[in-house]
Swiss-Prot record:
One of its GO terms (molecular function) is magnesium ion binding. One of its GO terms (biological process) is regulation of glutamine family amino acid metabolic process. Pfam families: GlnD_UR_UTase, GlnE. The gene is glnE. This is Bifunctional glutamine synthetase adenylyltransferase/adenylyl-removing enzyme. Its EC number is 2.7.7.89, 2.7.7.42.
Length: 947
């Protein structure tokens, strides 16, 4: 065993002072001194449980002792009588065994592969032990879940990721998916439950037993987000539901995740065999699947973006050449060829590496280097985490922990360890890059083209200097360009740019100037780009991105030239530069029905319990998607209707994620309202009004929302901190508003306006569905019924959605006096015009002036409220374009008039989108859109001016 280094020998004196009575310095073995000096976790544990140290001193941990874990846990749980004592014993057992593993790992008593095996078996043992105890307890309470034939149904648990692969790290969380075989009901209990309810309750209790922090800590952080539909899906799924999902909706990234999936307990019963057989075709295709390559490229970009976004230069998992890249290399071959090569179907990385070598898919030397690097990195990761039982992969900055790791990795000192680490990660990165090889590089022609611009950049030409490369520009344009360059250089003098940043900037600027100054609008474009560059000069990573990827630079120039809004966004949030790397996705926004899934995948990379990171990730995702929508808008690949569709689908995905996050936080604190035990869903709905309800969002639109619940009176929550059920929903709505409006470094998510709720700002933030119906029928003003025309549920379970739709239909199909309605709608419009009157008399306000967008909206709303009692089909849609279509189809409005209003409406909205991209207000010269305005005014007079 390597003697303690000098810094650690000195630290030993601090350890001695903390030892419990009875343990003297001389009574401890050299091994004990080494472990207790290395790991604060081990030291804290033996201080609390001195008997563990005596046990370790008398009998060292063995390589195969994982075989005894199940028996040891069974003994520990023998006296457990309730959930509280179960949680206590699970935490005690986990800590005791983890100290043994830390001891064996620190002293290298067991090889590193076996350490990974022990960590994984411990987790599996605890999961299965807790499940089995809780299953029996739930059966005593509610009966045994059975299928229609009376066969008992088990809860099957898929361990995902490193747990499934038998490669768990020291302080890992665990990714699980719960399933049960067949529908049915419980039998033999005090009350019957259907199987879905039984297994959901069992799953909730199991997660609580493992995940909930107590005075004894927790067992594992449990992450359930890999299940179908993520947090918005059922906690537990039947086999049939799982099969439907993976056949119909399973994504590529879910295939990657499923490669490592393993049933906890490794049972070989009929149910387990059925589940394995059902999942295998989804993961491994029968043919050689080269479609993986594009997904592979996307994943590579995702890794690179994550490293840049989170500044992970010292991260041995996510950094360049880190653990994730090795896992990624191996999965590539599994997914491409695994269906044809059974040897590639292993869940574990090292056996799969051996198969890759045997199949000659990589050179033997590369495989050998990857194997050595993997074991080196995994040992370093586990040692790092065992210091404090902390989930981290970032190298320490303090001298003590650096000395600990250097000693634990058998290096002379920290610089030697860093040198070895750098070599291993460089080998991994080389193989990783060669596997895809899609990095861009400058061609000799591009170098030759940019060379003359080096003089312009580096020699600080004055306004009256002449240079051949600027000769094509007009005098004023040339002067502006030179002034902008000179001002930018002066700005740089105020910034703390290091030598590397200066070097990269000097490489980048000639290329940038060559591209910008070839444009007719060179000065305008450069004036938009230099603020962005000034903002990132101290962040060399982003300069390197633009320097190393010429395509990204070209897209940056094109988008900034087209839109100051995009230029401003990029300057405020430079992480969006990552989106420029792939033109295939930049100009092709996410499919309208895929935003929720894309966001779910994006959020999986963020710890579920880290609220701050979750808030940042939501905002970053929104900004990236907005950039892609705007880029497609500028490129002309999205018509105006589609722009709004995409912006609306994006907003709905964000609402879904925010509600999920708020719900999770509230349930963790209070439990859920007890009435939900008797129904599916959450008893909560979010209704979108205005532009959101009408599928007409713009780039900077806020969200008009109201919140509904169906909680009866006198219902309490079922958590340890009970509160009134209706109070729960009020706090939930407040939490949602907070998550939307909290300002982080990435800004706010959306401005949310909830004043359209019953009684407006004076009313309760969240309303019961019954109270909402009563208000709409007996108290609401006509303008509130107009608003209801453009309202729809944007988040909610089917039961509440149906209830809201029925209320909306009832209100809209109520017969009204035509004259009274006409007067009220017209007077409301006149009030709005007086209140929001155009302050630019020589300009036409596209939205608010006569003949503008609001007039068209009022015409549509008036006609729906006037005629829906005769033509109920008019209530079907909430957007103006389809309402106009319905008015024509149902004979209310002449088809020619409806078509003309639709064209006018989309034309005006298109102009508003483009003005937003130019960061211009929504008004134009009075001479603009005269034809459209005249048409709208004529229609207004026809329908809303009294005869």
């Amino acid at each position: 065993m390597t003697p303690l280094s000098s810094p650690l020998s000195q630290y030993w004196q601090t350890v001695v002072e903390r030892l419990p009575e009875g343990f003297t310095e001389t009574s401890l073995s050299v091994q004990a001194k080494s472990v207790l000096t290395f790991s604060d976790f081990a030291l804290d544990s033996v201080i609390a449980h001195p008997e563990w140290l005596a046990e370790l001193e008398s009998a060292s941990p063995q390589a195969d002792e994982w075989r005894h874990y199940a028996g040891w846990l069974q003994e520990a749980l023998a006296g457990v009588c309730d959930d509280a004592s179960l949680m206590r014993e699970l935490r005690f057992f986990r800590r005791r065994i983890m100290v043994r593993i830390a001891w064996a790992q620190t002293l290298s008593l067991v090889d590193d592969e076996t350490i990974l095996q022990q960590l994984s078996h411990l987790a599996e043992t605890l999961i299965v032990g807790a499940r089995d105890w809780l299953y029996a307890a739930c059966c005593r309470e509610w009966g045994t879940p059975c299928n229609p034939q009376g066969v008992p149904q088990p809860l099957l648990i898929l361990g995902m990721g490193k747990l499934g692969g038998g490669e768990l790290n020291f302080s890992s969380d665990i990714d699980l998916i719960f399933a049960w075989p067949e529908h049915g009901e419980t039998r033999g209990g005090r009350r019957e439950l259907d199987n879905a309810q039984f297994f959901t309750r069992l799953g909730q209790r199991l997660i609580k037993a493992l995940d909930q922090p107590t005075m004894d800590g927790f067992v594992y952080r449990v992450d359930m987000r890999l299940r179908p539909f993520g947090d918005s899906g059922p906690l537990v799924l039947s086999f049939a539901a799982l099969e439907d999902y993976y056949q119909e909706q399973g994504r590529d990234w879910e295939r990657y995740a499923m490669v490592k999936a393993r049933l906890m307990g490794d049972n070989d019963d009929a149910w387990s065999r059925e589940l394995r057989a059902m999942l295998r075709p989804f993961v491994f295709r029968r043919y050689i699947d080269f479609s993986v390559i594009q997904s592979l490229r996307n994943m590579k970009g995702m890794i690179a973006r994550e490293v840049r976004r989170r500044g992970l230069k010292d991260n041995i998992k996510l950094g360049a050449g880190g653990i994730r890249e090795i896992e990624f290399i191996v999965q590539v071959f599994q997914l491409i060829r695994g269906g044809r090569e059974p040897s590639l179907q292993s869940r574990s990385l090292l056996p799969t590496l051996d198969a890759i070598a045997a199949l000659h898919l990589l050179p033997e030397n590369d495989v050998a280097q990857l194997r050595v690097a993997y074991l080196f990195l995994r040992r370093l990761e586990n040692l790092l985490q065992s210091i404090n039982d902390e989930q981290t992969q970032t190298l320490p900055a303090d001298d003590l922990n650096r000395a600990r790791l250097a000693w634990g990795m058998k290096a002379e000192n920290w610089p030697q360890l860093v040198g070895e680490l750098t070599d291993h990660m460089a080998n991994v990165r080389r193989v990783f890059n060669e596997l895809i090889g899609d990095d861009e590089a400058d061609t000799p022609q591009e170098e030759e083209r940019s060379e003359p611009w080096r003089e312009v950049w580096q020699d600080a030409l004055q306004e009256d200097d002449s240079t051949p490369v600027l000769a094509h520009l007009a005098d004023e344009e040339r002067r502006q360009v030179l002034t902008l360059i000179a001002d930018f250089r002066k700005e740089l003098d105020k910034r703390p740019i290091g030598p590397r940043g200066r070097q990269v900037l000097d490489q980048l600027m000639p290329h940038l100037l060559a591209d910008v100054c070839s444009r007719e609008d060179a000065a305008v474009t450069l004036s938009r780009i230099t603020p962005l560059l000034a903002g990132i000069v101290t962040r060399t990573t982003y300069l390197e991105l633009l320097s190393e990827f010429p395509g990204a630079l070209k897209h940056l120039i094109m988008l900034c030239a087209a839109s100051p809004m995009i230029a401003s966004q990029l300057a405020r949030y430079p992480l969006l530069l990552d989106e420029l790397l792939d033109p295939g996705t930049l100009y092709q926004p996410t499919a309208t029905d895929a935003y929720r899934d894309e966001l779910r995948q994006y959020l999986l990379r963020v710890p579920e319990e880290d609220e701050e990171q979750q808030l940042e990730a939501l905002r970053q995702f929104k900004q990236a998607q907005l950039l892609r929508i705007a880029a497609a808008d500028i490129a002309g690949t999205l018509p105006v209707m589609k722009v709004s569709d995409h912006l609306t689908w994006l907003a709905e995905a964000m609402i879904d994620a925010v509600v999920q996050q708020a719900w999770t936080q509230m349930v963790a604190r209070y439990g859920q309202p007890a009435h939900l035990d008797e129904r599916q869903g959450r008893g909560f709905a979010v209704v979108g009004y205005g532009k959101l309800g009408g599928w007409e969002l713009g780039y900077s639109s806020d969200l008009d929302l109201i919140f509904l619940h169906d909680c009866p009176m006198d219902v309490m929550t079922n958590g340890e901190r009970e509160i009134d059920g209706r109070q729960f929903y009020l706090r939930l709505a407040q939490r949602i508003m907070h998550l939307f409006s909290t300002r982080t470094s990435s800004g706010i998510l959306y401005e949310v306006d909830a004043r359209l709720r019953p009684s407006g700002a004076a009313g309760m933030l969240v309303t019961s569905a019954d109270a909402f119906a009563d208000y709409q029928q007996h108290e609401a003003w006509t303008w509130e019924h107009q608003a209801l025309v453009r309202a729809r549920v944007v988040y909610g379970d089917p039961q509440l959605t149906s209830q809201f739709d029925a209320v909306r239909r009832t209100i809209m199909t109520t017969a009204r006096d035509g004259k009274t309605l006409q007067t009220e709608v017209r007077e409301m419009r006149e009030k709005m015009r007086a209140h929001l009157g155009n302050k630019h008399r020589d300009r036409f306000d596209i939205k608010a002036d006569e003949g503008g967008i609001t007039d068209i909206e009022f015409i549509a709303q008036y006609l729906v409220l006037r005629y829906a009692h005769e033509k109920p089909k008019l209530t079907r849609w909430s957007d103006n374009v389809r309402i106009l279509e319905l008015l024509a189809q149902n004979g209310i409005m002449d088809e020619h008039e409806a078509q003309a209003l639709t064209v006018a409406y989309t034309t005006l909205r298109d102009e508003l989108h483009h003005l937003a991209l130019q960061e211009l207000p929504g008004h134009v010269a009075q001479t603009c859109f005269s034809k459209e305005r005249a048409l709208v005014q004529a229609s207004w007079r026809k329908w809303l001016v009294a005869v």
